């Protein structure tokens, strides 16, 4: 797939070379994004409260328990009225679960569809997709929203594909998106803590930056004096990024030096891109790939080719303030699927 990302109208508020990012999110953009997350409607405490009402023994807060004991002189007794009702709804979902079956539009492809159905059944079983969907549905019923990740497994010993539930606290998304699948949303962020040793093992090329950041080891001995350039350029930029980042985001929000952990920000965002498409049917178009012999053959036989403007999904990975990866993808949707129950009109 070849797509030319259109340059942004501005660099998201970049004020220096440290901030700039060619066709991607800068550090300033990440800061603005995180601040935008804080400015969203305050629905998360209500969702946490709804989950607490479902859990056993969490119907009364510590303050209410103390008040009942002291003012009423009785021992508080909690009766969970919603637990059984929700379990009944979840049981109906489990009973109605069925295998995914692929059906061909034409009889001549029936054998192919049978083989694909078998492969789909295997993938569903090995990736525990049914359990992940049930967990996402359960979170949707209890608190209004659930998330499921569909991606490739990073461990070569695991099944190639993984379908796993993701806690709602880890996901932040574009609140302005109207579609239930978020295909009109500009961005989605997943925030999660990672242990330093695992992060370094997966990305050894960033060992020095990650260890210095978690250990807060930007000592004066390792940093250049004014007017000196003895420090490596990458480390110097990392130190400057961390110093600037800490002005707006508290350090304890993304770094745990005691536990040796650092928070990763997995940013998926859409940018305008110009592509060349090949018309393969009245209603179907594909991005033209000049390295694909089938596409080249189709064009030589007279297939129509035209330019179009689309949205390209990029993925940017930050470890705290340190941008590690910013790459384009061929995805048409984010790898995180939302399970919405009701959405507030806000």
Segment roles from a protein language model:
Residues 334:
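Internal mixed-charge
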Residues 1-311, 322-330:
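Extended, helix-rich architectural segments
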Residues 317-319:
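Hydrophobic/aromatic interaction determinants used to assemble and anchor large protein complexes
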Residues 337-346:
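Short, intrinsically disordered, charge-balanced linker/junction segments flanking boundaries
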């Amino acid at each position: 797939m070849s797509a030319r990302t259109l340059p942004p109208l501005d660099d998201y508020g970049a004020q220096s070379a440290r901030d700039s990012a060619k066709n991607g999110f800068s550090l300033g953009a990440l800061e603005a994004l995180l601040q935008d997350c804080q400015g969203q409607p305050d629905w998360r405490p209500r969702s946490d409260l709804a989950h607490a009402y479902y859990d056993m023994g969490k119907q009364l807060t510590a303050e209410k328990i103390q008040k009942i004991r002291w003012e009423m002189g009785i021992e508080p007794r909690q009766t969970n009225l919603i637990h059984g009702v929700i379990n009944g709804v979840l049981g109906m979902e489990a009973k109605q679960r069925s295998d995914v079956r692929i059906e061909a539009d034409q009889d001549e492809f029936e054998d192919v569809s049978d083989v694909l159905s078998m492969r789909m059944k295997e993938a569903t079983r090995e990736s525990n997709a049914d359990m992940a969907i049930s967990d996402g549905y359960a979170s949707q019923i209890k608190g209004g929203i659930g998330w499921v990740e569909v991606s490739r497994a990073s461990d070569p010993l695991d099944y190639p594909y993984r379908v796993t539930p993701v806690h709602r606290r880890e996901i932040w998304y574009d609140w302005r998106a109207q579609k239930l699948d978020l295909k009109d949303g500009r961005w989605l962020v997943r925030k999660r803590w990672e242990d330093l040793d695992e992060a370094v093992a997966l990305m050894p090329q960033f060992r020095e930056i990650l260890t210095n950041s978690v250990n807060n080891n930007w000592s004066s001995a390792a940093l250049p004096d004014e007017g000196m350039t003895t420090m490596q350029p990458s480390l110097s930029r990392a130190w400057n990024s961390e110093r600037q980042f800490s002005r707006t985001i508290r350090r304890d929000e993304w770094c745990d030096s005691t536990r040796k952990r650092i928070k990763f920000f997995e940013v998926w965002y859409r940018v305008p891109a110009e592509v060349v498409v090949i018309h393969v049917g009245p209603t179907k178009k594909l991005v033209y790939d000049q390295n694909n012999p089938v596409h080249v053959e189709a064009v030589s036989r007279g297939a129509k080719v035209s330019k179009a403007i689309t949205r390209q999904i990029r993925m940017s990975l930050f470890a705290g303030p340190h941008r590690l990866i910013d790459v384009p993808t061929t995805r048409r949707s984010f790898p995180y699927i939302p399970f919405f129950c009701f959405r507030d009109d806000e």
